[in-house]
Amino acid sequence: NPRTLIIAWLIKARGMSGATLEKFAKPELIDHIRNARTDDLPLAVSAELPDWVIEKLQQSMADADILALGRALQQPAPLDVRVNMHKASRDSVLAQLQAEGLAVEATPYSPWGIRFRDHPAINRHPLFLDGSLEVQDEGSQLLAMLLGARRGEMVCDFCAGAGGKTLAIGAMMASTGRLYAFDVAEKRLANLKPRLARSGLSNVMPQLIASENDTRVKRLAGKLDRVLVDAPCSGLGTLRRNPDLKFRQSPESVAELTQKQAAILRAAAKLLKPGGRLVYATCSLLAEENEAIVEALRAEGGFSLLPVNELLAQNKIPLDTGDMLKLSPAVHATDGFFAAVLVKAAA
């Protein structure tokens, strides 16, 4: 019955003691739940993921790793923020927050990140209000870092959304050059405007586009130094924040997304100069949205893979997931992210 299920969840998932629950359940029921075996449950039940997701993950992951991933996705996500290096340094911001008694620490991978051990109302903090801080998962920060944008360059965040990565890229460019922020959703770009005003950046150009084939896109063909494509995806790497996504997605919806991802990446690739850098990223856990999309573009010719582990090592970041970035909440405490870095062949 529902009451028993709730008590079982409180004991098994939340770790509540029998003493805490003795007012709500008989000792016999508590003992029965505590002693119940769960090691013989189907993997989809233990990992709390749909069967179709399990089947896709099993193509590249061991069952033990899938179980660890599923359990990590049930835990609340930490609060990560990015220090706006155009306005402040991480050391100074970290010292100020610690002096205020806040439980914070530097993120282990992103040199811009700070992690809160709890979830204070950071949107009312003076450092947030003056643009020194932006809420951004550490994994998302690393996507911007892999783009490696430099002062004075021509850069595009092709699927900018509300602009978290746009702002990180703009800070890397020290508010110089030109940074296009494309998106098909007017509401998302509207959310970027107040964040952009706080950031102090003057090199960002938000532009609403109808699709990846918009004339605003095509006119930049062959002109850009770097392009980030954080493609629309299933979002299965963000289940800590959006647990309903696993019920809203399906094999059919993922198949539709892969067609869109391939089309967007192909259009974005045309914007690069010879020697330009292209970063393809998702917050998906599925190879068909990740490696398969990258390999399809490479098969068309004209792009080579730049190993992510080498880029991270050059930036003295202690993280090695191979030649492509694969972040997991079970291993890295970030959302699930994928990224590949491609370089356009010289003319």
For each of these PLM feature ranges, what is it?
Residues 91-347:
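Rossmann-like S-adenosyl-L-methionine
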Residues 1-124:
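Class I Rossmann-like S-adenosyl-L-methionine
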